[in-house]
Amino acid sequence: MRVLHFFRTYYPESYGGIEQAICQLCTASQASGIDSQVLTLSPNINPPELIINNHKVFRAQLDLEIASTGFSLSVLKKFRELAADADIIHYHFPWPFMDVIHFAAGINKPTVLTYHSDIVRQRLLLLLYRPLMLRFLTSVDRIVASSPNYLESSSVLGRFSDKVRVIPYGIDKASYPTPSEDLLAKWQQRIGGKFFLFVGMLRYYKGLHILLDAAQGTDYPIVILGAGPIEDELKKHALRNRLD
């Protein structure tokens, strides 16, 4: 079986949670005889094809990005080519331009969509996008939510509950790097043995500003590990809250 994953970002340019989830799926499913491929956008497509963890990654040129939505003039042709050879197309939501490609390609293949996040911040743009979004979600065969709570709390998922299946994210512990004893001792000396740890892309919808507000007046160490569009904003927020 051949599965085509489609999302706006992927390794090696971006190492976020969605990218990790896609990579884990591609890697773990190899044992079941599934040949996974990933199509993504990149500002640098040299080379246009990569091998990562024994699966192929195809990169189309990123031509424009507006409100975290990447656009590409060349990706439609590549999507049609790869989708024609795929048995299943696996979309990763949200990415409004993906909806356009889905309908423009005219590919009649079984489709799965993993619903990673509601659209929270761009509410005005959501009003314009909503008709296309609902049509797109209606057209796919199955929608995957990562938890029962997410299915219950998302008004969008609630509209499509008949086709939603809950499948939690999974991570292979064998893929974890092994830290050196010296590195462990260094960080234990710096932050102690107990602390709150966040690891991931720094994005507005993850509520890290709420975490920083909750930390005021406490002596519990907080470690935020990651990068993303709100990194500078979070650093300023920590300074305003007098968190060092």
Set out the residue ranges of the language-model regions.
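Short hydrophobic "strand-cap" motifs at the C-terminus of beta-strands
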Residues: F6, S146, I167, F198-G200, ...
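N-terminal strand-loop element at the rim of the active site
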Residues: F6-Y15, A21-G70
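A conserved mid-protein helix/loop that constitutes part of the nucleotide-sugar donor-binding site
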Residues: Q20, K194-G217, P229-D232
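A short, histidine- and acid-enriched strand-loop-helix "catalytic/donor-clamping" loop
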Residues: A67, P96-F97, T111-L126, S139-R142
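An aromatic- and histidine-rich active-site surface loop
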Residues: S74-L76, I88-N108, Y115, V120
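A short, active-site helix/loop in glycosyltransferases that binds the activated sugar's phosphate group
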Residues: T138-T178
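A short helix/loop element that forms part of the nucleotide-sugar donor recognition site in Leloir-type
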Residues: P177-I191
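Nucleotide-activated donor-binding/catalytic signature segment of Leloir-type glycosyltransferases, i.e.
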Residues: I224, D232-D244
